[in-house]
């Protein structure tokens, strides 16, 4: 009997405790004002000052700089991939060649003639 009344008490108090916790958590957020160093969101745009404009400009500039850097890195990776891919295709063509004097030189990534040492196109 005692456990039943304790369970009823906990069931009744739990929603009230949750509401109080949510209210206590939101109170500082609602009381905070837009000061320097805090994050402020405006809906109508009437609170646009010089600092927020400068911060937005710097953020955009940083994004553009990192975007440019990412593009350079991606271009370099693509070039390296294309170079390796072309070398693999050339090696396969050289190995499948009907020319018995053709061999693949891995250091230079070229198909060479065994007798003359010159590059050949199989």
Curated annotation (Swiss-Prot):
Ranges where the record places region Disordered: 46-71
Residues in the signal sequence: 1-31
InterPro entries: DUF1283
Pfam families (UniProt xref): DUF1283
Keywords (A to Z) from UniProt: Signal
Keyword set includes Signal: yes
Recorded family membership: Belongs to the UPF0482 family.
HAMAP family linked: UPF0482
Record protein name field: UPF0482 protein Spro_2288
The species this protein was found in: Serratia proteamaculans (strain 568)
Record lineage: Bacteria, Pseudomonadati, Pseudomonadota, Gammaproteobacteria, Enterobacterales
């Amino acid at each position: 009997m005692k456990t039943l009344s304790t369970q009823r008490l906990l069931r009744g108090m739990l929603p009230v405790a949750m509401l109080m916790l949510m209210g206590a958590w939101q109170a500082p957020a609602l009381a905070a004002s837009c000061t320097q160093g805090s994050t402020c969101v405006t809906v109508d745009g009437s609170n646009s000052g010089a600092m927020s404009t400068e911060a937005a400009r710097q953020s955009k500039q940083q994004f553009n700089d990192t975007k440019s850097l990412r593009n350079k890195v991606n271009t370099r990776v693509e070039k390296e991939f294309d170079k390796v891919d072309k070398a693999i295709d050339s090696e396969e063509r050289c190995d499948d060649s009907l020319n018995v004097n053709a061999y693949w030189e891995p250091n230079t990534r070229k198909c060479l003639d065994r007798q003359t040492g010159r590059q050949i196109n199989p």
